[in-house]
Amino acid sequence: MKWITLICLLISSTLIESRIIFKRDTDVDHHKHIADMYNLLTERTFKGLTLAIVSQNLQKCSLEELSKLVNEINDFAKSCTGNDKTPECEKPIGTLFYDKLCADPKVGVNYEWSKECCSKQDPERAQCFRAHRVFEHNPVRPKPEETCALFKEHPDDLLSAFIHEEARNHPDLYPPAVLLLTQQYGKLVEHCCEEEDKDKCFAEKMKELMKHSHSIEDKQKHFCWIVNNYPERVIKALNLARVSHRYPKPDFKLAHKFTEETTHFIKDCCHGDMFECMTERLELSEHTCQHKDELSTKLEKCCNLPLLERTYCIVTLENDDVPAELSKPITEFTEDPHVCEKYAENKSFLEISPWQSQETPELSEQFLLQSAKEYESLLNKCCFSDNPPECYKDGADRFMNEAKERFAYLKQNCDILHEHGEYLFENELLIRYTKKMPQVSDETLIGIAHQMADIGEHCCAVPENQRMPCAEGDLTILIGKMCERQKKTFINNHVAHCCTDSYSGMRSCFTALGPDEDYVPPPVTDDTFHFDDKICTANDKEKQHIKQKFLVKLIKVSPKLEKNHIDEWLLEFLKMVQKCCTADEHQPCFDTEKPVLIEHCQKLHP
């Protein structure tokens, strides 16, 4: 595992001027043409991607209508691969695609706004189409019996219908991801149609598939959030950390090349240039396999797969084993008297070999970025002091202690989860975050706590050396979504600081937040709590939700309550529920007991 060298590489990557990487089509115009994409893929895959893209742009059109357009585009693409290609074939694929849409008279009839879009020139035309996409998550799925019958008779029709529904309901989802999900859906259908209880199988497996879909979409949106809200050095540093984690073998030059190419295609994706994005992603897979021997011992299995499957395999590939010869002690970077001389030469450490230890658990990319920032600050301070080695000699201890603290905090949370279970762990998170952000709505706070508990359930179950990357990576995505929703008006100054100060420190900033001292709790009145007999007939999940709403209300009116007092009042609440739900008349009992509970709560109110 690499710590300090990755930190040094992250610093250098932000200071090195971006250079030309793997050769593009031409130095003047690197836009891809339709024949390029067609030649990269099989015809089946090309048509699948085209269907996904037209479904994202023309969301109201039926599958039958779009299939005709897909066939026209496919036929044209095929003609562009031959000797008789027309000048149109040389247009950038994005331009050609929107030319085809605008030339279809049905588009103008069904989409009135398209007339305005089609009057524009690219890239404004493409931006106009994207601006009119509607975000609705209401896919139409056939019943299990119908699905199995269609899959048996016409499997391609079923999979095309899935592409259409998934793409039009997720108009910004990376189109190859739509095809990946379609492939997984096909395997799901094949499996469930063999099961006796098809309804149960489809319900469970589709839930898993949709969770995977949302995870892919969340990660894609998170990258774009970084691109749109932080300097480019942040996304580059994050990509370099990821490349260096996955491929510990290559030298910095090769790692930096892959970082640059990855950053380039992510920016194209986030700016809406989906065609450039797709072809660059596929080309990156090609380049990865061309350098597989230099990169990783584990790439062989991916590079033997078809291109689309190969890309997903590479993205999800486990980290390669760290070569033993790369290990160097951390003291090389904090006790070397010549560190400042090396830093002054080019503000980077290109020749330093990685320091790593296979016995030490993996660190998260967020930790590496934050440490890089702190290490850079340390050198900028110490290298201008009277005695630089004396100034930076404690740097190793600082990094080690911070890492130990993070591992300890993660272990503490996993221990709570394992000891008390997900629901009580969720309540623990609910208490923490209600105190940090009491201005947030009850339902939103409950939703955040539930998602955090899900992350804990997942990440605490992985091997220990994967826990920090898992937990901090997923939590950073969740917190980023929360910050994005609040960016126009933050709910308090402390949240605003965490969301806008530093990407790498965002998660740790939220963790360190205490109760919002500026918050003035509302008075406790008859309207503060609402109890009715619905809780007596609710199922277990509904009862848990009602209890959590009471918990949030309690914290909001008494944010300084200690944990033991919170537990005490939750117990009082449960006693009231038990008493009233066993009474002959439920609601009169709640009406009688409510003032007693409120009176106690008022005594706790500051």
From Swiss-Prot:
Chief location category: secreted
Zinc as a keyword of this entry, yes or no, is: no
Q: Does the keyword Signal apply?
A: yes
Tissues expressed in: Plasma.
Residues of the propeptide region, as annotated, are 19-24
Q: Which residues form the Albumin domain?
A: 22-211, 212-401, 402-599
* Cystine residue pairs: C80-C89, C102-C118, C117-C128, C148-C193, C192-C201, C224-C270, C269-C277, C289-C303, C302-C313, C340-C383, C382-C391, C414-C460, C459-C470, C483-C499, C498-C509, C536-C581, C580-C589
A single Gene Ontology molecular function, please? lipid binding
**Organism annotation:** Xenopus laevis (African clawed frog)
What this protein is called in its record is Albumin A
Per the record, the gene is alb-a
Record localization: Secreted
Classify the source by domain of life: Eukaryota
Q: What does this protein do?
A: Binds water, Ca(2+), Na(+), K(+), fatty acids, hormones, bilirubin and drugs. Its main function is the regulation of the colloidal osmotic pressure of blood.
Q: Which family does it belong to?
A: Belongs to the ALB/AFP/VDB family.
Q: Which residues are noted in the entry as Cu cation-binding?
A: H30
Q: Which residues form the signal peptide?
A: 1-18
Lineage of the species this protein comes from: Eukaryota, Metazoa, Chordata, Craniata, Vertebrata
- UniProt keyword annotations, A-Z: Cleavage on pair of basic residues, Copper, Disulfide bond, Lipid-binding, Metal-binding, Repeat, Secreted, Signal
